[in-house]
């Protein structure tokens, strides 16, 4: 099986899953090539699993024609069985290459279907997303395939390196600093829980506002901004709890990161976490935007070691039974086989 990936993403959970899947498919014997944007911090993590090409697709630019020419040359030389586009921009660039099975993986809810003209099958990461795509009028095939995380044991970072006391309760938040991720609410919630520190692993356009909020609340001594980390598990290993506070979260890799690191998770009732997680079984769930409820959940975890242990075990079991690397990789390989057989 030969697969050509097109991915014009930047930095974040979607990119982590892209790297995870490429490497998982490589280990299953799939030959792969990938077209990505230049300068990606995660390029080195792809190099063992795929031959990499770099380029930028812009709608109004002469460079798009050069990139299209390069892609056509790669397709002639590589002759892929499958072309897989990742998200909107890559789907717009999907070639009408009749010799390959053409799929697009949706990481979020599309506003319309105009970008998927050359796509035969849409892969949705939740049943709700698949239903919304049908409502928009998609008549071709849909598959629902979730994500997995490649949790790799990592030694904990030294708390002293982040000026954090050894006996503090440490909450870890992770992702791109955009409004919908709810980091401002997480900062406000942590303010209400004494002897609790917050490590924010990531970066993004909201960073300046988040740092300003931290200063306004007098929390500079308890909040740490670590920047992007290619392997965040060292920070998760050193923390005590993981929090997802998104107002909108289809099913990012972030939904599995705490479980993968063996940490108890608190999550907002956004779309993805609501499908994946069960309140009191493998996570504590709070309403979106409920800073008071989030603070209460953090305090509850801080004060109840038995609850932390129970939620960690429940999360590990959910990850193993529903969202394992093997199960998700098997689903993609089965989709590839069925699609290629129809050509």
Curated annotation (Swiss-Prot):
UniProt-recorded name of the protein: Lipopolysaccharide core biosynthesis glycosyltransferase LpsD
The EC number(s) this enzyme carries: 2.4.-.-
Metabolic or biological pathway, per its Swiss-Prot or TrEMBL entry: Bacterial outer membrane biogenesis; LPS core biosynthesis
Family: Belongs to the glycosyltransferase group 1 family. Glycosyltransferase 4 subfamily.
Top class in the EC scheme: transferase
One example of a Gene Ontology biological process annotation: lipopolysaccharide core region biosynthetic process
SUPFAM superfamilies tied to this protein: UDP-Glycosyltransferase/glycogen phosphorylase
GO molecular function, one term: glycosyltransferase activity
Gene3D superfamilies xrefs: Glycogen Phosphorylase B
Keywords, sorted A to Z: Glycosyltransferase, Lipopolysaccharide biosynthesis, Transferase
